[in-house]
Amino acid sequence: METYARNVHLNGPAGKGQHTKMVNQIVLAGNMIGLVEGLLYASKTGLDPMLTIQTIATGGASSTALINLGPRMVNRNFDPGFYVEHFIKDLEIALEECSAADLCLPNLALVKQFYVALKAQGGGRLGSQSLVQVL
């Protein structure tokens, strides 16, 4: 695995890696909706969205999504790095695991609904950053 991955960790016995991936997808879902809302706010209040991304990229809001996908959202570049339809699948798995653990994550459920709406509009093969089209 070290041949194709920079960050390799054993998180426990079989199945724990899957749960770790779900944690990643849950956090990413929150980052994506926050990024979309932040960029919408920037735009509606007259800020330059690209300058705003550059400004906050070194602060507490910094994330891989902000740095890599924020500019693509602003430029309306929805070429896939990770397909919407695949992200929906992961979010569905995460929600199923939440249900099995008696855990309610309303933000996760809401973000999944936005992505499902995007897919219903023909965006299933777009990149996850195309979420900006839904709001």
Q: Where are the predicted features?
A:
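Acidic-glycine-rich active-site phosphate/pyrophosphate-binding loop
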Residues: 1-14, 64-70
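Helical "substrate-binding/catalytic lid" subdomain
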Residues: 16-135
